[in-house]
Amino acid sequence: MLNSPVVILSFIGAVLAGGFTVVYLQASHKTQLIKLLLAYSGGFMLSIAFTHLIPELYAHQSFQIGYFILLGFLIQLILEFFSGGIEHGHVHVHKNQKFPLALFLSLSVHSVIEGVPLGNMLEGISDPHGHHHDMESLFLGILFHQIPVAIALMTLLIKSNPSPFKAWLFLAAFALMTPLGVLVGMFVPAESLGLNQDIILAVVVGIFLHISTTIIFETSENHKFNLLKLVSILIGCLFAFTLNWL
């Protein structure tokens, strides 16, 4: 059973693990293993959106929930205008370039938004009408995606800032963003903002759809698949399918 300490520590640990692989294992956002992990996360996120989250939303809401899924898709499109697509591993780094603060803030907003519906689910764990069955899939979808994003961010931090301390400081701040969203979801009732949990989840589903489809089509050079990346995407999809029977 998931609980808030496990969720929060897992997200923080995933981001710091991404930074560790860059600093101590000399990995980067261009490393083959990282590209495969990104492809896997894209397949997983796309599958849980279609097989878990969207069916659950439409079971509780009318067709109008689709507007909020579209809103989430468009929000992510706007955020990527500032982030440069770092959410799906698309980042260009140059030695000693100035760190783009807008990118960091955009990525942070993205991470906070993702955490909010998970916090709603954790707070409503005893609610018989809550999305308990999808809490694990949403948690895993965010978690799997955090590691390659953290690797891309740490790569950019190292190239743009000569101070290792500052690089780790920025990464640690980013590691707290999704947990912050979880806490907001737990302690700030959606109703107090004139919303409900389904609307917030629908926005995140839209974000998932944008990121996962972009990952799938941009996961290799020249937008061409190779076999390993295709297999990684399929494994991500299959793992999401198995959650229906766990």
Mark where each language-model region is:
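Intrinsically disordered, metal-sensing/regulatory segments
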Residues: 1-246
